[in-house]
């Protein structure tokens, strides 16, 4: 049996609590990301990993030591680190003559590599190089994607999904206006991906809605798409499957229209309208001739019954 897949039995209560936190849940924990340096990572790649780690804090793990591994040839080391640090997202940085300033971004499913996309860094401006105010740690970003490629090409579609997964942060029910502090903007244009980070400034506008200004915060990256390792459609659908307990229960006889209005259908027994009490108006009073005919009908019914 592989060392990654063997069953670990806890020996202490602390170890038991630790393993219970990692067990599958209906509502999973926030996805953590691990940032790993390759055996030949240069200064540029190291700075990129540090800046991405600064954006991901506190939901990231930065490995400071170099790790000699090649993700597209052997993924066992990545899967080992994923299980060790309980991270389902990763970014691997390396540098060589064939692929200079290389980044590999990917995600795991059940501690096995699901999707993996290789990106080349063509231009980089660090957080420290842009002398503007920064956002506090743990701020949830707004993600903006511009460019038709993100909706047309399959590789770019998966890259968009992967970037959303990587930078989305915790899921929250409500967001206050002052909490919208910074934007991550991704633009796909002419075979390149431009990654920009802006701080959101709310200015006075003379009305209730504030005036919005964007101030570049960093980091800034110009990327180019290289190799891809994408999951099959069946495995991708399996990873997106929702547990039955989380699926909303269907309510009978209730429907909704496009505007969100709720309609309900009520099932009732057939009502005898002849016994319905109406307003006693002079015009609705029965005439003597009508009363005589009704009395005759009632008498005939009694005779038939007898």
Swiss-Prot record:
The answer to whether keyword Nucleus applies is: yes
Q: What is its main location?
A: nucleus
Q: Where in the cell is it found?
A: Nucleus, Nucleolus
Q: Taxonomically, which superkingdom?
A: Eukaryota
| Keyword DNA-binding found | no
Q: Which residues form a coiled coil?
A: none
Stretch list, region Disordered: 270-306
Give one Pfam family: Brix
Per the UniProt entry, what are the Gene Ontology biological process annotations, in alphabetical order? maturation of LSU-rRNA from tricistronic rRNA transcript (SSU-rRNA, 5.8S rRNA, LSU-rRNA); protein localization to nucleolus; regulation of signal transduction by p53 class mediator; ribosomal large subunit assembly; ribosomal large subunit biogenesis
Task: Name the InterPro entries for this protein.
Answer: Brix (IPR007109), Rpf2 (IPR039770)
The record, for SMART domains, names:
Brix
Give a Gene Ontology cellular component term annotated to this protein: nucleoplasm
One function term, GO molecular function aspect: 5S rRNA binding
Q: List the disulfide bonds.
A: none
The residue ranges of the Brix domain are 31-234
Q: Output compositional bias ranges, type Basic and acidic residues.
A: 287-298
The alphabetical list of record keywords is: Nucleus, Ribosome biogenesis
Question: Where in the sequence does UniProt note compositional bias of the Basic residues kind?
Answer: 277-286
Under the heading PANTHER family, the entry gives:
BRIX DOMAIN CONTAINING PROTEIN (PTHR12728), RIBOSOME PRODUCTION FACTOR 2 HOMOLOG (PTHR12728:SF0)
Q: Assembly and interactions?
A: Component of a hexameric 5S RNP precursor complex, composed of 5S RNA, RRS1, RPF2/BXDC1, RPL5, RPL11 and HEATR3; this complex acts as a precursor for ribosome assembly.
Q: Which family does it belong to?
A: Belongs to the RPF2 family.
What is the annotated role of this protein in its UniProt record?
A: Involved in ribosomal large subunit assembly. May regulate the localization of the 5S RNP/5S ribonucleoprotein particle to the nucleolus.
Q: What is this protein called?
A: Ribosome production factor 2 homolog
């Amino acid at each position: 049996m592989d060392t990654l897949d063997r069953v670990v039995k806890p020996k202490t209560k602390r170890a038991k609590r630790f393993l219970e936190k990692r067990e599958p849940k209906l509502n999973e924990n926030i996805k953590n990301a691990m940032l790993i340096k390759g055996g030949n990572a240069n200064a540029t790649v190291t700075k990129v990993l540090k800046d991405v780690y600064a954006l991901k804090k506190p939901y990231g793990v930065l490995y400071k030591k170099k790790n000699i591994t090649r993700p597209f040839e052997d993924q066992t080391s990545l899967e080992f680190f994923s299980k060790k640090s309980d991270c389902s997202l990763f970014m691997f940085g390396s540098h060589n003559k064939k692929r200079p300033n290389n980044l590999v971004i990917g995600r795991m499913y059940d501690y096995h590599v699901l999707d993996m996309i290789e990106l080349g860094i063509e231009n980089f401006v660090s957080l420290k190089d842009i002398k503007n105010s920064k956002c506090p740690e743990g701020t949830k970003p707004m993600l903006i994607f511009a460019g038709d490629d993100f909706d047309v090409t399959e590789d770019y579609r998966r890259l968009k999904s992967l970037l959303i997964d990587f930078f989305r942060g915790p899921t929250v029910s409500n967001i206050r206006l002052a909490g919208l502090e910074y934007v991550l903007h991704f633009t796909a244009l002419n075979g390149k991906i431009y990654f920009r980070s802006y701080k959101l400034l709310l200015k006075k506008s003379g009305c209730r809605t504030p005036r919005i200004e964007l101030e570049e915060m960093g980091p800034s990256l110009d990327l180019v798409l290289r190799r891809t390792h994408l999951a099959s459609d069946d495995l991708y659908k399996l990873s997106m499957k929702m547990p039955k307990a989380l699926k909303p229960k269907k309510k009978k006889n209730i429907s909704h229209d496009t505007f969100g209005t709720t309609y309900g259908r009520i099932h009732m027994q057939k009502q005898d309208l002849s016994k319905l009490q109406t307003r006693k108006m002079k015009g609705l009073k029965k005439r003597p001739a009508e009363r005589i005919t009704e009395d005759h009908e009632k008498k005939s019914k009694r005779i038939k019954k007898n």
